[in-house]
Amino acid sequence: MNESAKTLVAGLGSTHGDDQAGWLVAENVASQCRGYQHVTVRRATIPLDVLDWLDGVDVLHVCDACQMTHDHRQLQRYNLVEGQFINSDVSMNSEMSGTLLSLRSRGSHDFGLPDVLRLAAQIQQLPKQVIVWAIAGTDFQPGAGMTVETTSAAAQTVVEILKELRM
């Protein structure tokens, strides 16, 4: 990672069980990056919040919990390339697209993460590099705690982001 590249790590979440994963990642990355002047870490409750923070950002890491039924991996990393989410193996299939589309898009007036990233591109605010960390979750009930599996995947997400920040 280029030390001069301004990086934003955004953790999306809520108080609903495994949906806390993005916030947990943000808190842990922030505690590990206090001396990194080029790194900003924020917590968001809706993807649209991220749009307000993109000015001057070169690299964006977005961390969010989602229900993934097509894959048994607890953590998946996607790069946004020319409007498409690409993982290390193949282009994102329609099931994953639907998963990302539904992330925090609960009403007709809400924007899901893909919508926010498309809007950022249209208004020329999309960072040069966008990485989405999809953390598998199973329990999204209000007031529930995080499951052991999702907590572990969130911890692994922190490790992976820190590796990239130190490159």
What is the predicted function of each stretch?
Residues 1-128, 132-135, 144-155, 160-167:
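N-terminal catalytic or cofactor-binding beta/alpha core of small enzyme domains
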Residues 139:
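Conserved catalytic-site region of short-chain dehydrogenase/reductase
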